[in-house]
């Protein structure tokens, strides 16, 4: 059982490394929306890779939501999009951190798109 989990973790880190390589090849100044999910919560950060700073962040913990299920992921997506738009950011690069674009991750991304962000 330990080897199965280790392989899953290795696969996720390899997927994330592949995504980061693609971002390095793209030479644009768009901020990156980084999604991190745990078993209970979901986190979103807007990162500026040129200056190495966090522009805005939101999470199910910060919004005092009970967990990071799909409904609460939508609320986090709306919140991060509102914060980005208030800082005059309309377009971003999406980084799901090696997680599959499914379930909570896609719900957060769709809510951010509906609120006004362009990926």
From Swiss-Prot:
<dbReference type="GO" id="GO:0005737">
    <property type="term" value="C:cytoplasm"/>
</dbReference>
<keyword id="KW-0687">Ribonucleoprotein</keyword>
<comment type="function">
    <text>This is one of the proteins that bind and probably mediate the attachment of the 5S RNA into the large ribosomal subunit, where it forms part of the central protuberance.</text>
</comment>
<keyword id="KW-0689">Ribosomal protein</keyword>
<keyword id="KW-0694">RNA-binding</keyword>
<dbReference type="InterPro" id="IPR004389">
    <property type="entry name" value="Ribosomal_uL18_bac-type"/>
</dbReference>
<dbReference type="GO" id="GO:0006412">
    <property type="term" value="P:translation"/>
</dbReference>
<comment type="subunit">
    <text>Part of the 50S ribosomal subunit; part of the 5S rRNA/L5/L18/L25 subcomplex. Contacts the 5S and 23S rRNAs.</text>
</comment>
<comment type="similarity">
    <text>Belongs to the universal ribosomal protein uL18 family.</text>
</comment>
<dbReference type="GO" id="GO:0005840">
    <property type="term" value="C:ribosome"/>
</dbReference>
<protein>
    <recommendedName>
        <fullName>Large ribosomal subunit protein uL18</fullName>
    </recommendedName>
</protein>
<keyword id="KW-0699">rRNA-binding</keyword>
<dbReference type="InterPro" id="IPR005484">
    <property type="entry name" value="Ribosomal_uL18_bac/euk"/>
</dbReference>
<dbReference type="GO" id="GO:0003735">
    <property type="term" value="F:structural constituent of ribosome"/>
</dbReference>
<dbReference type="Pfam" id="PF00861">
    <property type="entry name" value="Ribosomal_L18p"/>
</dbReference>
<dbReference type="GO" id="GO:0008097">
    <property type="term" value="F:5S rRNA binding"/>
</dbReference>
<dbReference type="GO" id="GO:1990904">
    <property type="term" value="C:ribonucleoprotein complex"/>
</dbReference>
